[in-house]
Amino acid sequence: EFQMPFGFKEVEGIHSRTNFDLSQHEKYSGKNIKYFDPELGESYVPYVIETSIGVDRMFLSVLCSSYEDQQLEGGERRVVLHLPAALAPVKVAVMPLVRKDGLPEKAREILDGLRLHFNTQIDEKDSIGKRYRRQDAIGTPYCVTVDHQTLEDNTVTLRHRDTMEQHRVPIAEILPTVSKEVSMASLLQKIAE
C-alpha cells in the first residue's frame, strides 16, 4: 500500500494461494501435477504465490510523492514536481533571457547540441521567473539560461529544479553535467545508497 493524498491505496497485491489452485486443477483434470523433490525424496503439489502490480498505480504513487506546493517568501507559491531526474519526461529546458539580440539563436544552437542525447525543449514565452516556475511544475530537472554574457564567453546559467541553485558553466559542460544526473545508472546508484 501507498499513502496517496486521498488515503492508503494498494499498489501491489501479493496473494499466497498455497496449493489450493493446483490441487483443484489436479482433482478436476485427473492429471498428476505433483512435483517430485529429489532432495526430500517426496512428491507434493507446489504452493503458488501470485502477485499483481498495476503500472498506473505505481506511476500515480510516484507522481503523488513527487508533487509539492511550496509557499515562498513574499507570499508566492511554487508548484514543483520532484520527479527523479531519470524519470522526468523533459530533462532540460533552454531559455533565452530575452527574445532578441541573438539570444534565441544561441539558445537553439545549444538545444540542437543536447536534443540528440535526451528530451530537451526551448521556452521563450513570459519572464524568466515564470518560465522557471512552469518547468518546475512539469518536473524538468535543469534549466539553461542563455543571456548576453553567453555571447561573450560561451557560458550559461544552469539552474537545478529542486534547489533552485544557479551556476555559470561553460556550454561544453552542460551535456556531461546533465547526462550524469539524469541517467538511469545515477538513479539506481542513489537507490542503492
Annotate each language-model stretch with its function.
Residues 1-193:
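NTP/phosphate- and nucleic-acid-binding module
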